[in-house]
Amino acid sequence: MAVKIRLKRMGAKKRPFYRVVVADSRYPRDGRFIEEIGTYNPLTEPSEIKIDTEKAQKWLKNGAQPTDTVRALLKKVGVIS
């Protein structure tokens, strides 16, 4: 099972809000997921990023691959260098 840490789009049209989730790479973007580890709101100034660092580190240690966007968010929060 190829596990990814990626963004799940929520919110209304033109008002995106994202959940940072751990999901099998074969599932659709907004489909089933294994665990929610945080949220990301790009509409606030500055962008609001809330990520459970312990859960994120656990999944990264277990081999989950973050997408490019999530990797940038994890660097901002300080989970990865």
UniProtKB/Swiss-Prot annotation:
Keyword hit for RNA-binding: no
GO molecular function: structural constituent of ribosome
Pfam family, one: Ribosomal_S16
Protein keywords: Ribonucleoprotein, Ribosomal protein
Recorded GO CC terms: cytoplasm; small ribosomal subunit
Classification via Gene3D superfamilies: 3.30.1320.10
Statement: the UniProt record of this protein carries the keyword Hydrolase: no
Bilayer-spanning residue ranges: none
Cross-referenced InterPro entries: Ribosomal_bS16, Ribosomal_bS16_CS, Ribosomal_bS16_dom_sf
Superkingdom in the source lineage: Bacteria
GO process terms (BP): translation
Record-stated family: Belongs to the bacterial ribosomal protein bS16 family.
Official protein name in the record: Small ribosomal subunit protein bS16
Native species: Acetivibrio thermocellus (strain ATCC 27405 / DSM 1237 / JCM 9322 / NBRC 103400 / NCIMB 10682 / NRRL B-4536 / VPI 7372) (Clostridium thermocellum)
